[in-house]
Each structure stands twice: as C-alpha cells, then as structure tokens.
Amino acid sequence: MGAITLDGKATRDEIFVDLKQRVAALTAAGRTPGLGTILVGDDPGSQAYVRGKHADCAKVGITSIRRDLPADISTAALNDTIDELNANPECTGYIVQLPLPKQLDENAALERVDPDKDADGLHPTNLGRLVLNNPAPLPCTPRGIVHLLRRYDAEIAGAHVVVIGRGVTVGRPLGLLLTRRSENATVTLCHTGTRDLPALTRQADIIVAAVGVPHLLTADMVRPGAAVLDVGVSRVDGKLAGDVHPDVWEVAGHVSPNPGGVGPLTRAFLLTNVVELAERE
C-alpha cells in the first residue's frame, strides 16, 4: 500500500479561498493589500518565480507592485528602490528576489527591508521575533510544512522530527516553529557534519529533506508509516529532482510530492503574510 499524498496544490487552493474573502473585506474597508517584488537581472528561474507570485496575487485580489531592475544596477540604486517600497503606502509587504548579482550584498539588501513589510519572514529582526515567540511574519516554507502536516492529520505534538538541512530559509526556522508550544515536536537538525544520518532518520516520525541532493533519502532510511516532506530542488539530466527517492512512497505513511507538495504552500503563505500585515494595520 502506497503513502498518502500530502497534496500542496489542493491545500493551496483552500488557502486561496480563505485569502480571497479576507482581501475582499480589507478592500471594502479601504485597505487593499499590496505585494511588492524587487527583481534584479534576467535569471529565468527568478523571473518565473516572480511571475507566479503576481499571478497568485491576481487570484485573491492583492495588488501587484513590480520593480524590475537591470543586472548591472549599483548598490545605491537598489537601496533607493528598497527605500521607495518601504515608504510606499500601497505596498503592504514585499520581497527582494534572490539570488542577486555578485556585485550586490544580499544580506545588506535584506536588512534594509522594513521588518514590518517583510513578506518572506526572513528579516533578521523577524527571525529574532520567532526565537522570542513574538508576533511577526513567519518564514513561508516552514509555515507551509507545518500547515500541510496539520491538514492531513499527521501528528506533530510529541513527534520526533528529523530535518535534513540547516539553511536559513527552511531548516533553521523550521526547527524553531516545530518546537513552539503550539507544535511541541522534538527536532533533530541534521547537516553535512551529521555522522550517521540513516540511524537518525529511522527513528523519526516525520522527516523533512531540504538539502538539494537528488534522492538522498531512500526507503531503507525511513521508518514504516513515517511522514516525509520533500523540499529539496535540484536537476538530474535537465529534469527537476527532489531529495526523496521514489521508493520511499512504498514505506512512508505520508509523502509530499516534489513538485506539487510544499512549493505551492510557500507561495500561499507569502500572500498570507501580506494579508496578515494588512489586517494588523
């Protein structure tokens, strides 16, 4: 018997129905939310991501605010654009699309964003608020992972969760989310220095693979019935590949497909962050 699919697309559509109603209420009150994007250069992947985000905005009624800049832009010109969106009353929240060209300092750009307009939830101030369990925009992918587990009734409270990957967008903030009292999981954060990864994953109730190593997690590393979320993205022979080997579906109880699992929820919670920022105003 195969695993239950953690369907990110269907779950995203449910979230969009709720967001559309909330945006309509905000618009009726004269506070239409606006999502801004700053895109530097012509990287095809980044362009596709930004197009997708603005298409999502149109579905729920959020105003789109795009700032597309040339690849050879100076730091001063990028800073001017960030400052403009910080001051723009129509822009409720926004993102600086990464990666940036090599002449630009990504960390400096992200720190210049107003923390109260941080749609990604990755500003250092907001990550600090997450540590303190204070209200703040939450990182979108970790929030999507938690929501997807809850949507399919995967038990989180008391569960042992093994997270493979310690990146700032997924691994580290996910550990903080899952150990809040509202989730109450026990988290093991694994990385390249982990000595015996299979021994740890075999103990896990939930495994989140987020390293970008194709088919890293195989069936022999998974306890029967465990929930497995595939967040990593890489390419093999020109095709997208996740971190989870297809044979895991025969062992696990729940698996998120890749694509179509966590990815749609990352975008859904980007919009959710913007709507919540508008509701707080």
From Swiss-Prot:
Catalytically driven reaction(s): (6R)-5,10-methylene-5,6,7,8-tetrahydrofolate + NADP(+) = (6R)-5,10-methenyltetrahydrofolate + NADPH; (6R)-5,10-methenyltetrahydrofolate + H2O = (6R)-10-formyltetrahydrofolate + H(+)
EC number: 1.5.1.5, 3.5.4.9
GO biological process: L-histidine biosynthetic process; methionine biosynthetic process; purine nucleotide biosynthetic process; tetrahydrofolate interconversion
SUPFAM superfamilies hit by this protein: Aminoacid dehydrogenase-like, N-terminal domain, NAD(P)-binding Rossmann-fold domains
Organism superkingdom: Bacteria
InterPro entries cross-referenced by the UniProt entry: Aminoacid_DH-like_N_sf (IPR046346), NAD(P)-bd_dom_sf (IPR036291), THF_DH/CycHdrlase (IPR000672), THF_DH/CycHdrlase_cat_dom (IPR020630), THF_DH/CycHdrlase_NAD-bd_dom (IPR020631)
Keyword terms, alphabetized: Amino-acid biosynthesis, Histidine biosynthesis, Hydrolase, Methionine biosynthesis, Multifunctional enzyme, NADP, One-carbon metabolism, Oxidoreductase, Purine biosynthesis
Residues bound to NADP(+): 165-167, 192, 233
Pfam families: THF_DHG_CYH, THF_DHG_CYH_C
Sequence intervals crossing the membrane: none
A GO molecular-function annotation: methenyltetrahydrofolate cyclohydrolase activity
Record GO cellular component, one term: cytosol
Family, per entry: Belongs to the tetrahydrofolate dehydrogenase/cyclohydrolase family.
Function: Catalyzes the oxidation of 5,10-methylenetetrahydrofolate to 5,10-methenyltetrahydrofolate and then the hydrolysis of 5,10-methenyltetrahydrofolate to 10-formyltetrahydrofolate.
HAMAP family according to UniProt: THF_DHG_CYH
Name of this chain's protein: Bifunctional protein FolD
Lineage: Bacteria, Bacillati, Actinomycetota, Actinomycetes, Mycobacteriales
Gene that produces this protein: folD
